[in-house]
Amino acid sequence: MARYNPLAFTSGPVVFFITITYTALLIALLLTHLTLPSYPSHPPLGINLTQAWSDLEHITREFHPYNSHANDNVRAYLLSRIEHMMASKKLGSDQVQIIDDNISNATFSSGNTTVYFEGTNLIVAVRGSHDDQAFNDRNRRPDNGGVLVNAHYDSVSSGYGATDDGVGVVSVLQLLSFFTEPKNWPKRTVVLLLNNGEEDFLNGAKAFMRHDISQVPHTFVNLEGAGAGGRAAMFRSTDTHVTRFYRKSEHPFGTVVSGDGFKKGLVRSETDYKVFFEELGLAGLDIAFIEPRAKYHTIEDSTRETSLNSVWHMLSAAIATTSGLAADTSTPDRESHDDAVWFDIFGKVFIVFQLHTFFALCVTLLVVAPLTLIGLAWSLHKADRNYLFARKAFVYSADDDEPIHLYGWRGFFRFPIAFGIATSIVVGLAMMLSAWFAVSWFLLHGADAMRPSALQRMYSLLWLFIGSFCLLVFFTILANNHQVAAGYPSLFCFATVFLANVLSFLELFLAPPKSAYAWNVHQNADGGSRPLTSSATAARSDNRATTDDDATETTSLLSGNRRSFARHDAGRRDAINEGANSQEPESRRRLDLGQPHSGEQEWSGKLPSWIWIVQFSLLAPMIVILVGQIALLLTSALYQTPSDGNSPLYIYTSIAALAVFLVAPIGPFIHRFTHHVPTFLFLLCVATTIYNLVAFPFSEQHKLKVYFVQRVDCDTGVNTVSLTGLDGYVQRIAGNMPSAQQSSLNCSTPDIVTRKELRMCEWEGLHPNVVSPTSQYSNKTRATDWIDYEIFHDDSNNRGRR
C-alpha cells in the first residue's frame, strides 16, 4: 500500500492548505482594517492623551459651524488652551509666535458663486533651530522652509464634528505641546494652523493664504476626518519625498488607490489639501478618517462614536510624519512632484517607491517573463520533455508507426471558459465571492472528472499568466500616460504568476522523454506486458481514457486490438533484443512511470506531487494581501457614496473585479476540491443573495442621506424647498414632508454636474421667519429688506469692492 503524502496534489491536502491559508489571511486583513492599536500607557514626552480627550469633549459639546455662537466659544477655548500651554513651556516668545488672525480675508469666484470670507484662524509658529530669518521676510531662502500642520475647528451644521475635525484639532494642540519641549525642538519651523471655515468652500485655508506666514512652509500635513472613529489613513500625497516620512509611523495605514480614487472624483468632497497643494504649491499629504461614511456629517460624528485609540492613531502618525519633515534639512524642490506608489502591509510595514520605478519594473517584467518561459519551453523541446500541446509521439517515425497519444491539449480551454462564466455571474450578482468559487469548481471539477489531465494546473497557470500580462500592460500604460498608481498589485501578481509558471515548466523536466515514453508504451502493447507503473488500476484507467479519446464516429470497432504483421514482427524483434536493454539508449530502456493521479496521463506518474503547494504559496498570499486590502478600503469608503451622486455601476463593477482577483489564485487548484466546500459556499451564496435582494438597503447604522436646500428669492419672495437624493427614495421622503402635503412635487435631474445620478424634488416651502413678525426690528421679515449693499468701482485702479 502506497504511503500517504500530506503534501500531494490530492483533495485532502489541497482543501486543508488552501482553506487554512485563505482563512488566516482574511482574518488578518479584517483585524487590521476593523480593530485599532491600543494607545500607550506612557506616551512620548510632551503628549498628554487625557488632556487631548478632555479637549475633544469640550469642543464637540455643540454643533459649531462657522459664524455661530458655539463656533466662537470653541475658538475662545482653543486660544485659551494655546496660551495656557505656552505659559508652562520653557521655549521663549522669540521661539514661539501665537497669531490670533482676525484680519486675513478672501474673495473668490467659482462658476455662478462669488464668496467673500473673513478669516478667524488661529496660528502658532514654532521657530526651527535652523531658521534664522523673520517669518515676514519676503526673501526667505528656499532651504529655510517649514512644515505646516493643519486642522479645521468648524463643524457642519448637522454634526458635533468629533472626527471632522475634532480629533485633528486636538492632535494639533498636542503637537504644539510636543514641539515646544526643548528635547523635541524641530530643526525646521513648524506652523500649526487651526483654520475656521473649511466646511464652506475651504474658506479657512484660503484666508490663511493671505497671511505672510503662509510663505514659510514648503511641506504640509493635513489632518481630516470623513467618518467616525476607526483608523486614520494616509489618504493621499503629492510626491514620493514627503510620503517616505509617513513610513516612520508606528501603525501606518493606507494605499495609493485612495489617492487615485480621489483624483478621479470617486469621493465627492474636498479637503484643505486642495488649497495647500494646488494654490500654495506645497508638497504634503492627507491623513484622514475614512469610515464609517454613513456617520460622516451627521449627529453621530461625536465622541461617543470614536475612542482614544482613534485619537492616538492619528496623533502618532502626525508626530512621526511632522518630526521627519521638520528634521529634513534638504533643499525643497517645489517644481518636482514625482508621483508615488505606497501601501501598508497589515498596518505594520509601509512600502513606498516612485511611480517611475513602478513603470520601469513593469516594462522589465513584461519583457523578461515571456522570454524566460519561451526559453524554458525551448529547453523542454530540446530535452524531448515538452508535453504541452503535444498530441502524440512516434516510436520510430510518422511514416510507419501508430501514434502514441500524449493528450497534451487536454484541459487547455477549461480555465478561461470556467473563469469567464464564473466572473460573469459575479458581475451580474454584484456580490458574492462564494458564487465565483462554486461555479468555477462545478465547471473545472466536472471537466476533470470526465477527462482527467495532468496539465490542467499548468494550463490554468498559463492562462493566469496571459491575463495578468494583459492587465499589467494596461496599468503600465495608465501609469505612464495618466500617472495612475492604483495598478501596483498587478506588478506583484504578475511576478508571482510568472514564478509559478516557471515551476511548472521546470516540473516537466522531471517527466520522461516523449520518445522513451512512446517506446515503452509500444513495447508494452506489442509484448503484451503491462506498463511498469505502481498500480495496475492507474494503467487501466489511463488505457480506458485513451480509448475513449481516440474513438470517433469513423473509428473501426476492431481498431483497439488490430495488429499488422509488420508490427507483430517488430514486436518480436524487440522482444528478442530485450535482454540488451542495458546497452541501448535511454529512449529504448524500460521506464518506471510511477503512479499517475487517477485517470491522468501515464507519463505524469513520476512528476513531483508537492510542487503545487509552492506555487500556491507564491500566488495566494501576495494577491490576497494586496487585493484584499484594497477591496476592504474601497468597500468601506465608497459603499455610501451613491447617495452623494456616484454611479453605482462603477462601484459594483470595481467590487466584483476585486472579488474575482481575490479568489483567482485558487483557480489552478480548485478541481482537486471535494464537493463539501463548494456546496457550503453555494448554499451561502443562495441565502445571502436572497437576503440582499429582499432586505431594505438602509438602516440606523447605514443611513440614506439627502441634500436639503431652501431658496428664497429676495426680489420676488418666491420660496422653494428641494430634496436631492437617490431616485425611488427621495420621492417618498419628499412626499412625507408636511410642507409638501399641499404642494405638487416637481422631480427632475439636478443642475449640479456631480449629482446627475440623483433626483431633485422641489415644492413651495414655508416662509422662513428669520425674525419674529411681532418684533420691533425695522425691516421685519420682508425678504427685500434682508440684504442692503452697495458696490463701488474704482476706475483708476480697475478694482471693485463690496
UniProtKB/Swiss-Prot annotation:
Cofactor note: Binds 2 Zn(2+) ions per subunit.
GO biological process terms on file: proteolysis
Annotated active site: 198 (proton acceptor)
Matching CDD domains: M28_Fxna_like
Chain segments carrying region Disordered: 528-554, 570-603
Binding positions (Zn(2+) 2): 164, 199, 297
Main localization category: membrane
Cofactor(s) required for function per UniProt: Zn(2+)
Topological domains, Cytoplasmic: 1-13, 379-389, 445-457, 512-609, 671-677
Top enzyme class: hydrolase
Record has Transmembrane helix as a keyword: yes
Membrane-spanning intervals of the chain: 14-34, 358-378, 390-409, 424-444, 458-478, 491-511, 610-630, 650-670, 678-698
Membrane topology: Multi-pass membrane protein
Role this protein plays: May be involved in vacuolar sorting and osmoregulation.
Protein name per the record: Vacuolar membrane protease
